[in-house]
């Protein structure tokens, strides 16, 4: 920073600094320090006013009785006195740019300080405050410059701050290896304790095993001493020993898949011998013919009986007619009391037809209402009241699965819907139309 003007310090200002104090005389400025350097530092602090004035003159109105009283007062500390400026402080005052850079560096370094540095700085703060106030107090009162804040911190304070920072860093760096050493020592102690515990557990386990083995051996010895617990077994005699079976090495032995059992009945159990010899057969035929000739040639004939009961028209009651099933929903299934229909083979309790043919009987002539109407176009009520009615099997028109299979034909299945689709009332007419077309 270039100074606008350079002027010498007036005589009055020099007299103030050279005047003796209460406790110790002020020796004055050193001889080796030129007065021109001090004047340059003063001019740098008041650069704004010096730019406007080429010839700066000292104004005596600033030196009042109060100013003189302030300089004559005792310092803050009785043990510490002001001994004047050193050469480094004077050089610092001659280079204001260096002062500003150090001040800015110190201001930037303050936020980065940790808690430990703040604690250490709080202890050093009273001393710095006193020295700062003492060193900058005279300049502030003597010169009344507007830029006094820039040059308020001297080199001594900055050097003290730097020394304190370096000491704190050294302490911090010394603490870190100590902390690492402490953690390493703690880990070693823990590992030693664990190994000691493991060794103690293994030792205790070995002792327990040894004690258990000794106790078991003692118990076995006591049991062996009592003969009742362990009776002596005599080896079997040589005569009772079974002779080992001879192994067959000739040929391959086939595995028995179905071995014989003691509970299985013998072969040909409950079987009759139907084989006849020729002589015995001729004897039987001869005896049969002889009996026939003795009886006069008339053989006894047996009358064929109907399996089912024959019911005439007079035996049909009104209750039987009301019990006729018109649709499939009217049919009630009963496997005990019901009778079977020849067409559908379902055992129901509804009234069915009765064939009037003397040679027909049983299930052959029984048809339920839905089957007789859909398959043949007839009514059960009319069939029961007709004394000459015969069943479809007797007439040779039965189209059930059994009768068609007997005739060498396949079963038709449910054809009533298809027959009605083509305009026929029953399956018999539909099958007859198909037979005519073929």
Swiss-Prot record:
Signal sequence, renumbered to the chain: none
Residue numbers spanned by region Disordered: 74-199
For the region MYC-binding, what residue ranges are annotated?
201-223
In residue numbers, the region (PSIP1-binding) covers 56-115
Q: Where is the composition biased (Basic and acidic residues)?
A: 152-167
Q: Which residues carry this modification: Phosphothreonine?
A: 75, 86
| Record localization | Cytoplasm; Nucleus
InterPro entries cross-referenced by the UniProt entry: CDCA7/CDA7L, Znf-4CXXC_R1
Q: Name one GO biological process term.
A: regulation of DNA-templated transcription
Tissue spec. comment: Expressed in all tissues but not detected in total brain.
**Keywords annotated in UniProt:** Cytoplasm, Isopeptide bond, Nucleus, Phosphoprotein, Repressor, Transcription, Transcription regulation, Ubl conjugation
Q: What ranges does the record list as Basic residues composition bias? A: 168-177
Spell out the Acidic residues composition-biased ranges: 75-86
The short sequence motif called Integrase domain-binding motif 2 (IBM2) sits at 63-89
Principal location listed in the UniProt entry: cytoplasm
According to the UniProt entry, which residues carry Phosphoserine? Answer: 21, 77, 101, 104, 135-136, 159, 183, 185, 249
GO CC annotations on file: cytosol; fibrillar center; nucleoplasm; nucleus
**What modifications follow translation?**
Phosphorylation increases its interaction with PSIP1.
The residue numbers the entry assigns to motif Integrase domain-binding motif 1 (IBM1) are: 9-33
Note the position of the cross-link Glycyl lysine isopeptide (Lys-Gly) (interchain with G-Cter in SUMO2).
Answer: 210, 213
Share what the entry says about its subunit structure, partners included: Interacts with MYC. Interacts (via IBM motifs) with PSIP1 (via IBD domain); phosphorylation increases its affinity for PSIP1.
The role this protein plays is:
Plays a role in transcriptional regulation as a repressor that inhibits monoamine oxidase A (MAOA) activity and gene expression by binding to the promoter. Plays an important oncogenic role in mediating the full transforming effect of MYC in medulloblastoma cells. Involved in apoptotic signaling pathways; May act downstream of P38-kinase and BCL-2, but upstream of CASP3/caspase-3 as well as CCND1/cyclin D1 and E2F1.
Protein's name in the database: Cell division cycle-associated 7-like protein
What gene is this protein translated from?
A: Cdca7l
